[in-house]
């Protein structure tokens, strides 16, 4: 029933939440995808940021709602509510920081606690431009993804490497989630309009 009528329906919306430790490049990946740019000045995300982009696929057009979460411990209590109605969780680590890689297991566990198996999870090893400082091999990333039954890709937000491919692969996986999306579409529209009151810090509403 959900096939065939796509073009007559309002634009389908899918919520992607970006998770991972501080400074792994979550904001940079979103900025590269949204604006094809990279800011060398690091600025920590304060609370939760939200951006939206229309993506044109071969068979339909979708709107991706990109939720950028803070990696700092003090904001962790906010994150489960954003995971709860997500269609996709993008869990990012820094290939030059083995601890950020080890912590992805916890982030993926958090996603599954909130969403069960009813979610697409993409594990992303970012900062391949710093290959000389690599602490996590691509084989280790692939192995963890296989063990945890998630998708995997390596990227460089700085160089633009594989960023479009990351979103293409996520988009290609979306049709299997249509029933979930239909069920949560109204909630997602409400959330989009809220711009969460949970943001605890008044300054720094934008940390792109």
UniProtKB/Swiss-Prot annotation:
Its EC number is 3.6.5.2. It is a lipid-anchor; Peripheral membrane protein. GO terms for molecular function: GTP binding; GTPase activity; myosin V binding; protein domain specific binding. GO terms for biological process: antigen processing and presentation; early endosome to Golgi transport; intra-Golgi vesicle-mediated transport; intracellular protein transport; minus-end-directed organelle transport along microtubule; neuron projection development; peptidyl-cysteine methylation; protein localization to Golgi apparatus. One of its GO terms (cellular component) is ciliary basal body. Belongs to the small GTPase superfamily. Rab family. Interacts with BICDL1; leads to its accumulation in the pericentrosomal region. Interacts with SCYL1BP1. Interacts with VSP52. Interacts with RABGAP1. Interacts with GCC2 (via its GRIP domain). Interacts with RAB6IP1 (via its RUN 1 domain). Interacts with TMF1. Interacts with CIMAP3. Interacts (GTP-bound) with APBA1/MINT1 isoform 2, also called Mint1_826, but not with isoform 1. Interacts with RIC1; the interaction is direct with a preference for RAB6A-GDP. Interacts with RGP1; the interaction is direct with a preference for RAB6A-GDP. (Microbial infection) Interacts with human cytomegalovirus protein UL32. This is Ras-related protein Rab-6A. It comes from Homo sapiens. The gene is RAB6A.
